[in-house]
From Swiss-Prot:
Catalytic activity from the UniProt record: (2S)-2-phospholactate + GTP + H(+) = (2S)-lactyl-2-diphospho-5'-guanosine + diphosphate
The protein's role, per its UniProt record: Guanylyltransferase that catalyzes the activation of (2S)-2-phospholactate (2-PL) as (2S)-lactyl-2-diphospho-5'-guanosine, via the condensation of 2-PL with GTP. It is involved in the biosynthesis of coenzyme F420, a hydride carrier cofactor.
Family under the similarity heading: Belongs to the CofC family.
Entries under InterPro entries matching the protein: CofC, Nucleotide-diphossugar_trans
Gene3D superfamilies: 6.10.140.50, Spore Coat Polysaccharide Biosynthesis Protein SpsA, Chain A
EC numbers, comma separated: 2.7.7.68
UniProtKB keywords: GTP-binding, Nucleotide-binding, Nucleotidyltransferase, Transferase
Name this polypeptide is given: 2-phospho-L-lactate guanylyltransferase
Name of encoding gene: cofC
Amino acid sequence: MKAVIPYKKSSAKSRLSPVLTREEREEFVDLMLNQVIDTLKEAGVGTIDILSPSMYGLENMTKANVLLDKNDLNEALNGYLEQAEEPVIIVMADLPLLSPDHVKGITSTKEDVCIVPGKGGGTNALFIKNPSCYRVRYYGSSFLTHCSIAEKTGQSVEVYDSFFAGTDIDEPEDLVELLIHGSGAAKEYISKKFRLEMSRGRVGLVHI
């Protein structure tokens, strides 16, 4: 089994721009990427590949292999799956609440495919036992699309239901979940910039 993490550092996480500058966002995504790599390693994943259209921010990467592919996300990932000769777990780089136990649970599925849904219909992680027989289609309601692809190709599916694994960091309100539930370098970075504040019965962010 091996893992692949799609990653692009340049101008990353534009939806966080109301609260983080471009430089801060790029620093933050780097921390999240490294945290996801460490999580995969702790879960016993031996081979970890980073699939990126650019070496920007990855020049000194030693914890994982860097594979350059300038194609769009789906084309790059499907090219990767075509060449894979062992099960593959695709993990997004913005999952700082993901734990080694989550990875072990996802990859120990008895089904052909295990899908971790993200917020708004996305796909946060996707474990594929027979990658040469599967093609991904991210963007939009990719969770439903990936379930449909498995069904149409005769592959059984498990949906891995986890709040933590399902929390990807895209919007300012997602940083609240990181501060409440997170640990590690990504949380430490955000905790130096924001604190939690109750307002009208809701927890929100306030700049320090």
